[in-house]
Amino acid sequence: MKAKSYKLKYVPTVQQLRDAGFRPGGSWMHENAFMFAERRFAYELSVSICFFPDLGVWDDFYNILVLDEEFGQPYTPFYSENYKKDIKGFPVLEYCIRQYNDFLDSFDFLE
């Protein structure tokens, strides 16, 4: 199981973001966050994605946060030496990666 890399297929409009479930805010992810969407799932984890006011400025490291909700900090096993590497034998991390990929795959403006 490996976290995919994502980039913008096209720059979405504010209305397209709203239609995709984005809401204003997201400052816990980045001080310049303008709109965000998130998915919470088991094991007290969540995946959030944000856009800055310049919607074309986006990458899959600075604009996405996998958060350990219990401790209120980035989920370290996702980011540390495991970041975007093939993971086997760690069920919680594999589940997290699957949720990350499924959530980001749901947006038609990402590829």
PLM features per residue range, with description:
Residues 1-5, 10, 31, 36, ...:
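Intrinsically disordered, low-complexity regulatory regions enriched in serine/threonine/proline
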Residues 3-26:
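Amphipathic alpha-helical segments
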